[in-house]
């Protein structure tokens, strides 16, 4: 129960910090989604590590999914069922209403197909990095030192220099 309260506190803090991103109109939500998609597309093209705010967006989505997971484990529910079966406070003040709206908008962003596609791409990038590390470990274990040195260094070997002594003349 304490962990659940901590998650809800984190979500409300996130709601306050991202208030400028979330608004009531559909045009602003679509503009936000378009901005997210363009940033995701550029990070996909560059194949670089994702910026920190995108990783925190992934963490926020997993946090939102963890908050909803006890209700969803009972069975498959649709969005309408989840809204109807949640325990709502008796008195809805402005703060709780705005927090619920922000959480709902974050859920819509996390459940959008484009975001899920981007999340799969990020997992593929992380898997490729892990595969490269595993291949390097295999090379280190199976290949002897000389062959490994020749693989990683492209320098030609220096010929042996024989000392000339009086007996060579």
Curated annotation (Swiss-Prot):
One of its GO terms (biological process) is positive regulation of gene expression. It comes from the Eukaryota. The record marks 159-161 as: Cleavage. The keyword Signal applies. Residues 1-22 form the signal peptide. One of its GO terms (molecular function) is neuropeptide hormone activity. GO terms for cellular component: extracellular region; transport vesicle. Its main location: secreted. Keywords: Cleavage on pair of basic residues, Cytoplasmic vesicle, Secreted, Signal, Vasoactive. It is found in: Secreted; Cytoplasmic vesicle, Secretory vesicle. Disulfide bonds: none annotated. Interacts with NTSR1. Interacts with SORT1. Interacts with SORL1. Belongs to the neurotensin family. Neurotensin may play an endocrine or paracrine role in the regulation of fat metabolism. It causes contraction of smooth muscle. This is Neurotensin/neuromedin N. It comes from Mus musculus (Mouse).
